[in-house]
């Protein structure tokens, strides 16, 4: 057993299996959080029927999608129609291979990891284009063409934002980028006298557009294109596009955290006396406090079964908080904790965009991409180059 645990392939294989097994569930609960947050913005409750406070809604949605009839349009290109969603989903999941979730939790440390993620995101758009074209529908084709044009427009700005981060870190390796921030003792967003805030904001805008999220969701604008590129999809194949979208959201959030927010590093990582308060106090207070807050909701639930489910959630949260107080467990998992907290903040920000901003017109979308985002990206690269040279002298 010890030989297996010490094998160099053990951790990569384990992380891969966990990602494949857990991501559909994680994506489902990201959707639940999105629905709850948007409901809160609109002074509503959101899903409340399935389980206490809607906690089982993602499972109900998954069962519904798996049991729905899978309809294939008569005049569609059936082979491509079937395969297109798989392209988007597979490329979305492949990007997870080079993301460092913690110091020792990753699948592969590739020396061009950032380039791999950029390549997979570009290839993933083929799934959308092929899906829209093979559907033999005007709505789907227009949505696919919009998606392609949007990718071309914002991929350049995204590349400039990433290039600024790479210039500061001095490497394309995702592990190396985090290590460079650890060596400097400051997150990437504060590098070059704080100017890296500009590439960070540019990255968030361009990445939101590239993943077709609101307010840049023109490829699936329901008021114009019914459902855009996946108008003709239903059931399991539609669910694959759905998984691909949320896989890409998680990936771009992970890249933002790795490049600009220190990856798995805790806040103020260079301040030694804050290590125990942040690494032990924050997770314990967060999980135990969430458990106690959930406990206060039990008496508001009438159904005995839902009360038992909530009680189980309370026990689980308190147990996780207690386990995180164990030094050996904390040392192994604290990096993953901070990484997921930071990623959650980015995802919440993207949900906030959806609930706040109206959808742009197509000409406005192109103007922002070509006349604002790309020039700002080019300028930020040049300014960061100058500041980097000044910092060395």
Curated annotation (Swiss-Prot):
GO terms for molecular function: NADH dehydrogenase activity; oxidoreductase activity, acting on NAD(P)H, quinone or similar compound as acceptor; quinone binding. Coiled coil: none annotated. It catalyses: a quinone + NADH + 5 H(+)(in) = a quinol + NAD(+) + 4 H(+)(out). Its EC number is 7.1.1.-. The chain crosses the membrane at residues 13-33, 79-99, 112-132, 158-178, 186-206, 240-260, 278-298, 309-329, 333-353, 368-388. It is found in: Cell inner membrane. GO terms for biological process: aerobic respiration. The keyword Nucleus does not apply. It holds the Pfam family NADHdh. The keyword rRNA processing does not apply. InterPro entries: NADH_UbQ_OxRdtase_su1/FPO, NADH_UbQ_OxRdtase_su1_CS. NDH-1 is composed of 14 different subunits. Subunits NuoA, H, J, K, L, M, N constitute the membrane sector of the complex. This is NADH-quinone oxidoreductase subunit H 2. It comes from Solibacter usitatus (strain Ellin6076). The gene is nuoH2.
């Amino acid at each position: 057993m010890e030989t297996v645990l010490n094998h160099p392939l053990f951790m990569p294989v384990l992380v891969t299996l966990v990602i494949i097994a857990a991501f559909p569930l994680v994506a489902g609960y990201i959707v639940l959080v999105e629905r709850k947050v948007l409901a809160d913005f609109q002074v509503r409750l959101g899903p409340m029927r399935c389980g206490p406070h809607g906690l089982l809604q993602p499972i109900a949605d998954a069962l519904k999608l798996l049991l729905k009839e899978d309809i294939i349009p008569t005049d569609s290109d059936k082979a491509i129609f079937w395969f297109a969603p798989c392209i988007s989903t597979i490329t979305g999941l492949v990007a997870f291979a080079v993301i460092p979730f913690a110091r020792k939790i990753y699948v592969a440390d590739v020396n061009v990891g950032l380039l791999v993620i950029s390549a997979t995101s570009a290839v993933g758009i083929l799934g959308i284009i092929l899906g829209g074209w093979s559907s033999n529908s005007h709505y789907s084709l227009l949505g696919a063409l919009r998606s392609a044009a949007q990718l071309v427009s914002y991929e350049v700005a995204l590349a400039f934002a990433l290039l600024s981060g790479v210039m500061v870190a001095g490497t394309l390796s995702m592990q190396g980028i985090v290590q460079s921030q650890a060596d400097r003792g400051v997150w990437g967003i504060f590098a070059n006298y704080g100017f890296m805030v500009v590439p960070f904001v540019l990255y968030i805008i361009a990445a939101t557009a590239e993943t077709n999220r609101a307010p840049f969701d023109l490829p699936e604008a329901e008021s114009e294109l019914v459902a855009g590129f996946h108008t003709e999809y239903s059931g399991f194949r539609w669910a694959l596009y759905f998984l691909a979208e949320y896989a890409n959201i998680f990936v771009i959030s992970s890249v933002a955290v790795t490049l600009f927010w220190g990856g798995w590093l805790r806040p103020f990582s260079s301040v030694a006396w804050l290590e125990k308060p942040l690494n032990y106090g924050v997770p314990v207070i967060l999980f135990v406090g969430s458990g106690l807050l959930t406990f206060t909701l039990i008496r508001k639930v009438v159904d005995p079964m839902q009360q038992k489910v909530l009680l189980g959630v309370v026990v689980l949260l308190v147990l996780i908080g207690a386990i995180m107080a164990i030094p050996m467990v904390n040392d192994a998992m604290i990096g993953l904790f901070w990484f997921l907290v930071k990623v959650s903040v980015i995802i919440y920000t993207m949900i906030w965009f959806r609930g706040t901003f109206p959808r742009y017109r197509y000409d406005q979308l192109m103007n922002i991409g070509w006349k604002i985002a790309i020039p700002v990206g080019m300028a930020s690269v040049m300014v960061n180059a100058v500041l980097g040279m000044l910092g060395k002298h």
